[in-house]
Amino acid sequence: VVHHKHGIGRFISIDRIDVDRRTREFIRLIYRNNDKLLLPIENLNLISRYGFDDNNLILDKLGSNDWLLRKSSVKKRIKFLANKLIKNAAKRDSININPLNYSQLELDKFNEKFEFIETEDQLTAIEKSLNDLTQEKPANRLICGDVGFGKTEVALRIACATYLSGYQFVIVVPTTLLALQHSRTFKSRFSIFNTSVATLSRFTSLKEKKQILEGLKNGDIQILIATHSLFKKDIEFDNLGTLVIDEEQKFGVDQKEFLINKHPHIHLFSLSATPIPRTLQMSLLGLKDLSVIGTPPSNRISIRTYVQKYEQVSFLTAITNEISRGGQVFIVVPRISNIPFVENELKKLQLDISYGVGHSKMKEKEIEDVFLSFTNGDIQCLISTNIIESGIDIKNANTLIIFNSNLFGLSQLYQLRGRVGRSNRRAYAYLFHDSEKLINKTALKKLQVLANYENLGSNFQLANEDLEIRGAGNLLGDEQSGHVKAVSYTHLRAHETTVY
């Protein structure tokens, strides 16, 4: 816990002690050198939860100035970061741009190709985003929606409005797999306009890259899907109007700031199921506009989630239950080196199933082939690293098994779980971990949080839990935990008036 005046100590117990002929309750805290502090229960407001893993934690010393010096240092750092943050926001807010002007009739033609009925939340997000494009100020909106709730369709509408207004559109994604999926989707939807859509990734050949860069510069390419390849100084645009950052939690602040500083006049939209604490904090503070898509598509069923120590019998049951109902299984490991272990387990269990393997070290053609086989139902199980976290949508795959789940981040686990349950069939997620003796309390808590949030649309609440577990970190994101560990998240919030 953190005492407002004395700093970080350890809660021991609540004691009943006789004082002046009456019994009172005290909170017993331990500080460095085993010094004890008894806090009257009526002064409970003076302490708060520390909120971080206590491994290697050094308690404060009673009577020392260390705590006050740390608080002062963090306050100064927050003030510096807040000033920088506000300066950047004010700079963009002071820019005047030409509102986008598009044909609603043409946009309606584009919308008709959407195969589903929009939810109310989705329509609201689309309406607000399109309204942003018609303003004289650059947009800066976070669209937070659960996995499979329709964020991509919002991006497609934004892209169409941008294209119809005569501007170029870019969507940047974290993985080549997601880039491939978006490439297929965008080309299909924009085929009615004969729009030039290009994809730029690490698999793009030098010849293709040269042609794409030339097309972006002279305006021949109107829509670009790009991975981290976009963060290069040699990329120039003829008339860039809008940038969408998909899975924004996957990108570093330097990368995002690079694009904004290079193109200060563009509209910016960020898509995320589980926004990083910094982005969520910025939205909660009003520095970004926020749209939440919290309504699931019709007939969607929540995913049953189990957290448990790995046992062969559980592994066997999970696979056979899914295969017996004609479904498919995702098996995910944290490292490529873990894949042989899973293959060996499958052999030990003598399961008569077909499976494929996918990971980032494979060639593009190999990755495409294995995912195409899984998509077409030619193989029953896919063993992979977290490259499936984004960019694969298979309605027949409704069981997810994750090995060493404690090694993944909370948002990673949430994204991975979103690979299943994308139809009206009940889906299951099994988060296997090592013995509870071998993993720390924070990792176990993280897994339990995910299991607790089974309901559809729980991504925003889960991001808030992540905010509490990890802290907001540096407001500008140059350090994910930043100085918050020095004083705890609660005390960081106590200084948030600095931002205003």
Predicted regions and their residues:
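Conserved SF1/SF2 helicase motif Ia
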Residues: 159-178, 182
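Post-DEXD/H (motif II) to motif III coupling segment of the RecA-like Helicase ATP-binding lobe
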Residues: 242, 249-302
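Upstream accessory/linker segments immediately N-terminal to the RecA-like ATPase cores of bacterial MutS
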Residues: 1-124
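Conserved motor-coupling elements within RecA-like helicase/translocase cores
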Residues: 206-223, 365-379
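Conserved helix-turn-beta segment of the N-terminal RecA-like "Helicase ATP-binding" lobe
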Residues: 180-203
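Motif I (Walker A/P-loop) of helicase-class P-loop NTPases
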Residues: 152-160
